Swiss-Prot record:
Keyword Glycoprotein on entry: no
InterPro entries (UniProt xref): DabA (IPR018752)
Annotated organism of origin: Bacillus cereus (strain B4264)
Location relative to the cell: Cell membrane
Protein name as annotated: Probable inorganic carbon transporter subunit DabA
UniProt subunit comment: Forms a complex with DabB.
Entries under HAMAP family matching the protein: DabA (MF_01871)
Membrane topology: Peripheral membrane protein
Job of this protein: Part of an energy-coupled inorganic carbon pump.
Family as reported in the entry's similarity comment: Belongs to the inorganic carbon transporter (TC 9.A.2) DabA family.
GO cellular component: plasma membrane
């Protein structure tokens, strides 16, 4: 069986027609764009491969890179012990698989073999090395195993390494990492790469012949190399002897060799027109260098690795799991022997783990169904509540919302944390914009934070004092002469900071934050909400009146909040608080591009309070009472507190609601913190003061796990709050409000699936990948990481740019996972015809469901659950 490129390609490409661009574009789908760690946008590694099934991609990765993306046997056994996998679902999955196969073995015999194999025990090494079994395999050499052969296209450097034990692929990676760091560096060095403005390939070509790390012969190969990246790439492929039909597979192999650096290159290529061909330049550099390194070994007789399947483990599996002795093997007809071997080959480790994963997911779905069914109640008897609070769909909001609802007359909603505002934000005194929306979208408006001119000048002056101290310290550290004196000058102060930060982190951290806030004295601010026609920027500043009304209407309708408004409506963005944490952005709001969501919450609340917006909404039937006031707050997930960031003048009833929230908030924080902290491995005893402990975690610069983040996320529930209000969902569910009765066209549901649904899926599969394949898709141990080039982290100083989450984000201990690697279950509360219409109209989503990238279920108006 030939293992081709995972992507369909044109094998009739004429390289003279510059179709190398198309090949690179097709090959690039095997890697995902990697955002800088400062914004750490969640992404799933296989976003470009969703046209294939999850099973196909799993098999391809196993063959091409020896990467296993199914949960390991130890994870599965641990989940079974915890009651997370029901055996009955495993038997159902096995029966479905057997029904789908064509074989000429008695069903009972096949089932017995599969049942034993599903225990996931390794075949004994003594059996695999047994002379008796190996002799039997030799005597059965007449069996045709051609259908079980695999052919894999590898980089020439890897192929030579496997044949001659030469460490060429590591040498090549070392060089590429070095050049990538030089070109992509954002903040690490004072000197930038010469000729960087001309592009990666030109800058590399200018310097490569002076690289002392290359031999004289290697530099000679590259001395008169083409100046154009596309021409250089085509020439390198030609001289390596790569046939046109194999080029795409070959490029895929090189991209997968360093998926982190290649992913960062791909992301950069999507950010500006100037760097749109950066991925071609990267491949031109990499494969040109490969040619220089491997040239002494060329030509090769065979450019593909032929993976011949040994029948020894197949025979051993029937002996061990099927109770067939070697004597019985010898007495079998050749056709029966072949049938057994093919069956054992099909029921390989990937299939066995796939069945276990399906059983795990079905168990989770059934447990969630039972929770929802046991707590459902009528949704039409809504009483007027004192306050309504809209939180981000983030799974960390679920426990906080649950405790808030229990302790007061409050109603909570779930909505994507950017509140439907496609904006780039610019904080007071900043010249930079941040795209405060999901990374799958582009901002349409720029919103600036404003104050009066005198206040702004004073504030900027105070900011410059702080930044000048930091820049002076950095300059002294990087200067040859002043770096000698820096330890003596800064030692006493930094030593004192180290001691106090280590022994009293909560007190010192709080003091530093208060001191910084006092010194800056940020003035009261407003926003540039009104549309500005004459703007030099690419994005217009502010909104037109129609846009203001449109964005407010869309968000309110999306969550079903179009009537029965409470006196106080609070838009709650969320943020995280941690110290000395490169992954701080990973704990922020994913819907706001890896930043805090308070800015968006404040802008939205301000829009809702505008008389012109309310008048327009009133004309459309959305009647917001005069005494209803919109405010904004920020839910700090690390300490489970609500910080008010925008509280306008309140009406009497709104003030009553505000005071009520303030009075119960300490209890809400205590309960939420206690629930969350007891999940951390550090806590095995009763917590006396959960809030104090949470603050210690947030301020301790030695703390490698300030919070679990979105670990254990498993479902995305789209429906009214009453569906889940009394459920303890254990902080595992994204919750988005939705009222199908206000969505006759289905457009609101389609937008939720296309936007927040996609973000939730990306988050889910990033956690999944970082758990099942941490060596390839994770980022290793935080304690041994190096932040490099202002972009991301490496292990040591010459590794791949690590694309995923650290060990501490998904693991309870060295041997036990905390995150359960399950594909996201999307549950929609709506009639079946709504789901059918969604699947018929949204081909991309239907493809995700059919190919196993997400799971889908629905709850109809009568409370009946349906798996799709």
């Amino acid at each position: 069986m030939s293992i081709p490129s995972i992507l369909k390609k044109d094998t009739n490409i004429d390289m003279q027609e510059n179709n190398i661009n198309d090949l690179v574009a097709s090959a690039s789908r095997v890697i995902a764009p990697l955002w800088p760690i400062s914004t750490f946008a969640a992404h799933h590694p296989w976003m470009g491969l969703e046209k294939q099934s999850f099973e196909q991609v799993a098999n391809w990765l196993k063959e091409a890179r020896n990467v296993d993306i199914y949960p390991s046997a130890s994870m599965i056994h641990s989940a079974k012990v915890k009651g997370e996998i029901e055996e009955s679902f495993l038997q159902m999955s096995l029966s479905r698989w057997l029904d789908s196969q064509s074989f000429h073995i008695p069903r009972e015999k096949a089932e017995r073999f599969c049942q034993a194999a599903l225990k996931l025990e390794k075949l004994p090494s003594s059996l695999l090395s047994s002379p008796e079994v190996n002799k039997l395999a030799e005597e059965m050499n007449y069996i045709n195993t051609a259908s079980m052969q695999a052919s894999v296209m590898q980089p020439i450097s890897s192929l030579i390494e496997s044949q001659n034990s030469e460490n060429l692929s590591d040498v090549l990676n070392y060089h590429i990492i070095k050049w990538c760091k030089l070109y992509l560096d954002e903040s690490g060095s004072n000197w930038t790469m010469p000729n960087r403005e001309k592009g990666f390939y030109r800058a590399w070509q200018h310097l490569i012949t002076f690289d002392p790390a290359l031999s004289k012969n290697e530099r000679k190969v590259l001395k008169d190399w083409p100046q154009d990246a596309e021409v250089a790439l085509a020439r390198a492929l030609f001289e390596l002897g790569i046939s046109e039909s194999n080029i795409q597979s070959y490029l895929e192999g090189h991209l997968l060799s360093l998926p982190g650096w290649a992913g960062m290159i791909r992301w950069r290529s999507q950010q500006s027109i100037q760097e749109q061909e950066l991925l071609i330049e990267y491949l031109a550099v990499r494969i040109s260098m490969e040619l220089a390194i491997v040239k002494p070994y060329l030509p090769l007789k065979n450019q593909k690795v032929e993976k011949k399947v040994s029948i020894v483990p197949l025979i051993a599996s029937w002996i061990y799991w099927g109770n067939i002795s070697t004597r019985e093997w010898l007495q079998m007809p050749a056709a029966e022997q072949s049938e057994l071997l093919v069956f054992a080959y099909r029921f390989d480790e990937n299939i066995r783990k796939k069945l276990w994963l399906e059983a795990w997911e079905q168990t989770h779905a059934e447990q969630l169904r039972e929770k929802i069914a046991s707590t459902q109640r009528a949704t039409n008897d809504k009483k007027r509540v004192l306050a309504q609070l809209a939180f981000c769909i983030d799974v960390r909001s679920e426990p906080f919302r649950r405790h808030l609802e229990k302790l007061g007359p409050f109603e909570t909603f779930g909505i994507a944390g950017f509140f439907g505002l496609p904006i780039a934000t610019s904080e007071l005194g900043s010249n930079n914009n941040h795209s405060s929306l999901p990374v799958i979208l582009k901002p349409k408006h720029q919103i600036k934070e404003l104050t009066n001119e005198n206040e702004l000048k004073s504030y900027e002056q105070r900011k410059r004092v702080g930044s000048s101290v930091r820049s002076t310290f950095k300059t002294m550290k990087q200067n040859v002469m002043t770096s000698m004196a820096l330890p003596e000058l800064s030692g006493p102060l930094l030593g004192l900071q180290m001691v106090t930060r280590s022994f009293v982190p909560r007190g010192v951290g709080g003091f530093i934050r208060k001191l910084r806030k006092t010194m800056l004295q940020k003035p009261a601010t407003t926003f540039s909400l009104n549309h500005v026609h004459d703007t030099k920027g690419e994005i217009p500043i502010g909104f037109t009146k129609e846009e203001k009304v449109n964005y407010v209407r869309q968000a309110l309708k999306m969550v079903g909040l179009t009537e029965k408004f409470a006196p106080l409506v609070v838009m709650c963005g969320h943020s995280s608080q941690s110290t000395n944490n490169p992954y701080a952005a990973a704990l922020e709001c994913g819907a706001c591009g890896g930043a805090a969501g308070g800015f968006n919450a404040r802008v939205f609340a301000t829009l809702c309070n505008l008389p012109e917006v309310r008048e327009a909404l009133f004309a459309e039937g959305i009647k917001i009472p005069e005494d209803t006031i919109f405010a904004a707050a920020e839910h700090k997930t690390t300490v489970d507190e609500l910080e008010w960031i925008y509280v306008p003048e309140l009406s009497e009833t709104a003030q009553e609601a505000f005071d009520c929230i303030e009075s119960i908030m300490p209890n809400v924080s205590q309960h939420a913190n206690r629930e969350r902290l007891t999940q951390l491995p550090n806590f095995k005893t009763k917590i006396k003061n959960a809030s104090k402990e949470a603050h210690r975690f947030a301020e301790d610069w030695s703390e490698i796990r300030p919070e679990w983040g979105l670990a254990r996320n498993a479902s995305f529930i789209i429906g009214q709050r009453e569906l889940t209000q009394d459920c303890d969902l254990e902080g595992r569910a994204f919750l988005h409000n939705y009222d199908w009765k206000q969505d006759e066209s289905g457009d609101i549901l389609a937008n939720i699936i296309a936007g927040p649904g996609t973000v939730a899926q990306w988050i889910n599969l990033q956690y999944y990948a970082s758990t099942v394949a941490p060596h390839y898709y994770g980022s290793g141990n935080k304690t041994t990481q190096t932040v490099t080039a202002g972009l991301g982290v490496m292990q040591g100083n010459a590794s791949d740019l690590l694309p995923g989450l650290p060990w501490q984000s998904v693991m309870q201990s060295d041997s036990e996972t905390y995150h359960s690697p399950l594909r996201l279950l999307i549950v929609i509360q709506a009639p079946s015809q709504y789901i059918e219409r969604l699947l018929n109209n949204d081909f991309t989503f239907r493809e995700k469901v059919q190919n196993g990238w997400v799971r889908l279920a629905s709850v109809d108006p009568k409370g009946r659950w349906k798996n799709w």
